[in-house]
Amino acid sequence: MNPVDYLRISLIDRCNFRCHYCVPDEASLQYLLTSEQLSNGEILTLLEQVFIPLGFRKFRLTGGEPLLRPQLVPLVRAIAHLPGVEDLSMTTNAYLLADLAQDLYNAGLNRLNISLDSLNPETFDQIIGNRGKSRWQQTWEGIQAAHRVGFDPLKLNVVVIPGVNDQEVLDLAALTGDRHWHVRFIEFMPIGNDKLFNERAWIPSEELRQRIRAKWGLETAFVQGNGPADIFKIPGAKGTLGFISQMSECFCDRCNRMRLSADGWLRPCLLNEAAQMDLKTLLRTGVPPREIRAAVKALLDQKPEINFKMRDMGTTTGQYGRTMSQIGG
């Protein structure tokens, strides 16, 4: 297994979209109160006194939608300036990004991943559950703003859902032709969305690659921070294509990350919520950071076994108790 040096930090469980694969229609969510979320100070304490001393060097801010987090820019600036932080990135839906892109860039945010599941405004609005208001144009303006201020690499994440947006794979791949953009196709997976998954299932990454290969050809490539993605490019294109194949091609041996939820639960494996640790309660009950660090180190030492032997036993009930929006993706 790779060294675990990457922490995904959910800043908030709320989102201004309600994407069907992330927050299913039937989901009844109880959002966290502000007091139930980790504060900026608590996040910084955990990074500075627990995770960085344990070798974590790369951090990604997620949600929900992280741009909804109050005092976001000062938090980004504080994390970016912590000794030991080598890379700070964010995943966002870009709806509020146009007005924040420059400030985030100036604060020290290195990279952005942006969810863009369709280039068709009607399909896009259907996927995000727009509730009567079209949001495609403002999202696209956010992506353009991120490009203008200099975020590089700029990655676009596409969750491919059969019969919904899979017919756009070639159009989305074409975005990489004349831009230094990196489009990543993600296999749809069943976490908190069993009904939609059972209705739609998923398309293997290799099938998507075959479609692209048949039109333009494909060659292997590299991009910074590729994580579990397999990277290719269309010959002559400026950008790249990534394929995240968590359903068809197990990549547990390449896993280098843990996840911290907005309410302080540390999750060593996306597919396993039975092995979580409540760091917020430890902090708020006065447990010294050195003891929290020792507990996290013990969980870190168990991660290979959790990944390989327990990924199919990731819940105690057979169903995940949290949606992707609550986990932080």
Curated annotation (Swiss-Prot):
Query: In the record's cofactor note, how is the cofactor described as bound?
Result: Binds 2 [4Fe-4S] clusters. Binds 1 [4Fe-4S] cluster coordinated with 3 cysteines and an exchangeable S-adenosyl-L-methionine and 1 [4Fe-4S] cluster coordinated with 3 cysteines and the GTP-derived substrate.
- The residues that hold S-adenosyl-L-methionine are Y21, G64, S115, M189
Pathway given in the UniProt record: Cofactor biosynthesis; molybdopterin biosynthesis
User: Where, in this chain's numbering, is [4Fe-4S] cluster 2 bound?
Assistant: C252, C255, C269
Can you provide one Gene Ontology molecular function annotated for this UniProt record? 4 iron, 4 sulfur cluster binding
Amino-acid positions noted as binding GTP in the UniProt annotation, renumbered to this chain: R8, R60, T91, K155, R257, M258, R259
- List its EC numbers: 4.1.99.22
The record's disulfide annotation reads none
Name the coenzymes or cofactors required.
[4Fe-4S] cluster
Domain Radical SAM core positions: 1-229
Q: GO biological process: any one?
A: Mo-molybdopterin cofactor biosynthetic process
* UniProt keyword terms in alphabetical order: 4Fe-4S, GTP-binding, Iron, Iron-sulfur, Lyase, Metal-binding, Molybdenum cofactor biosynthesis, Nucleotide-binding, S-adenosyl-L-methionine
Under InterPro entries, the record lists: Aldolase_TIM, Elp3/MiaA/NifB-like_rSAM, MoaA, MoaA_NifB_PqqE_Fe-S-bd_CS, MoaA_twitch, MoCo_biosynth_MoaA/MoaC, rSAM
Can you tell me which residues bind [4Fe-4S] cluster 1?
C15, C19, C22
| Catalytic reactions of this protein | GTP + AH2 + S-adenosyl-L-methionine = (8S)-3',8-cyclo-7,8-dihydroguanosine 5'-triphosphate + 5'-deoxyadenosine + L-methionine + A + H(+)
How this chain assembles, per its entry, is: Monomer and homodimer.
Function recorded in the entry: Catalyzes the cyclization of GTP to (8S)-3',8-cyclo-7,8-dihydroguanosine 5'-triphosphate.
Q: What does the similarity note say? A: Belongs to the radical SAM superfamily. MoaA family.
Matching HAMAP family:
MoaA_B (MF_01225_B)
NCBIfam families this protein is in? moaA
UniProt name for this protein: GTP 3',8-cyclase
